[in-house]
Amino acid sequence: MIRVKDKDASLKFYQGVMGMKLKRTSESPNAGFNLYFLGYGPDASEATANGVNPVSDNEGLLELTWNYETENDANFKYHNGNDEPQGFGHICVAVDDLDAACSRFEEKKVSWKKRLTDGRMKNIAFVLGMLPSCRYANVPTDIPCRSRWLLDRSCAKREAQDT
């Protein structure tokens, strides 16, 4: 779960830049927060038509938590996990074609922590998130997958599933 200050800007980034789809929303007005679940894979209507569960059959989901009115508080911020004291600091998204993914990110005018051509590791890139906290999106290619993207928070290697 990632807490976000501005749900609209966060959803725009993860959907428009990272290419995720909003899979489900859970609103809790009495508690003052909403949950947004994003991921890759078929839309609910496509999945249902093919007889699969559209949420549980995803390779991974990203949960965004938005507390009401935080976007209107100029002094409100979350710790990003990359500054001291360090903690959870990035999200890993594996792609089949890193060059194509980086070209897409260039077209979307993302900010980079590490471009594919920077440094010694040529099989990984870091995109800065749109959040003021600058959470990273880690984009490696060494994770085999058949889907367009694979979201795996732990960045553990996974075997491609046979279809």
Identify what each model region corresponds to.
Residues 74-83:
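Short, polar loop/linker segments at the starts of domains and inter-domain junctions
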Residues 56-58, 82-87:
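Short, low-complexity disordered segments enriched in Ser/Pro/Gly and basic
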Residues 5-22, 104-107:
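Amphipathic alpha-helical segments
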Residues 28-50, 54-59:
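C-terminal "cap" of GNAT-fold acetyltransferases
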Residues 43-44, 67-72:
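Active-site/binding-pocket entry motifs
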Residues 71-75, 145:
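Short acidic/His/Gly/Ser-rich catalytic and metal-binding motifs that mark active-site loops
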Residues 1, 23-26, 37-39, 82, ...:
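Vicinal oxygen chelate
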